[in-house]
Amino acid sequence: MANPVVSPESLLSEYADGPARLEAALTGLSDSELDLSLGENAWSIRQIVHHIADGDDLWKTCIKAALGNSDGLFTLQWYWDRPQMEWAEGWSYASRSVESSLTLLDANRHHIVELLEHDPGTLEKSIRLQPPHGTEVRITVREVLEMQVRHMTGHTQDIQAIRQAHGV
């Protein structure tokens, strides 16, 4: 099912508001409650926060590449070569404070929105993308922003589900 087309202003607003929505989902949680999850093999709230921030940081590079070099080829093959759980373990998602990740997420989103607001045509700029499996495609800045908004929304819902399951 295709996403309804939203105005550039609405998309940028939703993208910019992501960190505040994530912070709202975390409001009132103690440090130990950040370690709650839906099960033994499920990510904790803490791990989800780090995952969101790191994913956003990775895709920020795609946006900047599209703005500066539409003939370039963007790939995250180095990242896609390993399962996400290996990155989570290697980057200590389970034990690190979430503060630096929340700060990074907010700064990255603010930086990208500021870049995009200075040129009305930026959302349609694109770059070649080599996905992990399959053929090269062209991806627009709009598509990356939409993907990041969906990613944030999905994981914010995951956090709400964890909170509900544990009554916090």
Regions found by a protein language model. Give the residues of each.
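Long, hydrophobic N-terminal alpha-helical segment
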Residues: 17, 21-47
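Structural signal for well-ordered, non-membrane alpha-helices
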Residues: 19-30, 57-64, 106-120, 153-156, ...
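Short, contiguous alpha-helical
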Residues: 35-85, 127-168
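Extreme N-terminal tail/first-helix region
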Residues: 1-17
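Generic structural concept
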Residues: 12, 16-19, 42, 49, ...
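Acidic/His metal-coordination segments adjacent to aromatic residues that form catalytic metal sites
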Residues: 3-6, 45, 85-101, 134-142
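Generic detector of well-ordered alpha-helical segments enriched in charged/polar residues
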Residues: 9-13, 60, 64, 102
